[in-house]
Regions:
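Hydrophobic transmembrane alpha-helices and their helix-loop junctions in integral membrane proteins
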Residues: 1-145
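Cytoplasmic/organellar membrane-interface segments at the starts of transmembrane helices
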Residues: 84-87, 139-202
Length: 202
């Protein structure tokens, strides 16, 4: 958890930042399972589903950014939101879901895991909570440097925003994130019986 979060904070490339943050998120899943409670297991499964959607969306947008600009290094970016507002907005939405902001699919997943871990092992729960805070710090910092401010090159000012086909695909990810975040019962009701059975067998 902590290694992935602090390593992500030290990166200067969006792809490497996403790779190290993935390590941190998988660590959170393992911690939820290790709590050996139904809430922890539900949170772990929810987080896995959230991780698949959010990480896929972020890596897809990063790939589209690389296709347009030829680089995902922070030093080559900056001011991207001016010429690519849709791409920047979706990247922010997916990042907020990765941070576990209320209203996104990341919130119920992280809440269940943190609740389960804090009630079963307070020290591990506090470490996980610290990781969530660090995760918010590195994402906001890299997003500000990569997407906000003045454009750093003419390639950025002339870049095209999301096309119709790209917008359709990214929009599907966004819908899944918002539906699962605003109506988490749509996921929890499906996995309730299996998680309860798993806990009972333990």
């Amino acid at each position: 958890l902590l290694y992935g979060a602090f390593a992500a904070m030290a990166q200067t490339n969006l792809r490497r930042m996403l790779a190290f943050s993935s390590i941190s998120h998988v660590g959170l899943v393992l911690l939820g399972i290790a709590a050996f409670t139904q809430q922890g297991l539900q949170g772990a499964i929810f987080q896995l589903l959230n991780f698949v959607v959010v990480s896929s969306g972020l890596f897809l947008l990063t790939g589209l950014l690389h296709h347009r600009l030829g680089s995902t290094d922070i030093i080559s970016l900056g001011g991207t939101a001016r010429s690519m507002p849709l791409l920047s907005a979706f990247f922010l939405l997916f990042g907020l879901a990765a941070m576990g902001i209320p209203g996104t699919s990341g919130f119920p997943a992280e809440f269940l895991i943190l609740y389960a871990v804090i009630t079963t092992h307070t020290g591990a729960g506090l470490a996980a909570l610290a990781t969530v805070i660090v995760g918010a710090a590195y994402f906001i910092t890299l997003y500000r440097r990569a997407f906000l401010g003045p454009a750093s090159s003419s390639a950025i000012t002339q870049a095209d925003d999301l096309q119709t086909r790209e917008l359709f695909i990214v929009g599907l990810f966004a819908i899944l994130i918002l539906v699962a975040g605003l109506y988490p019962a749509s996921v929890l009701n499906v996995i309730d019986a299996s998680t309860q059975g798993w806990i009972n067998r333990l």
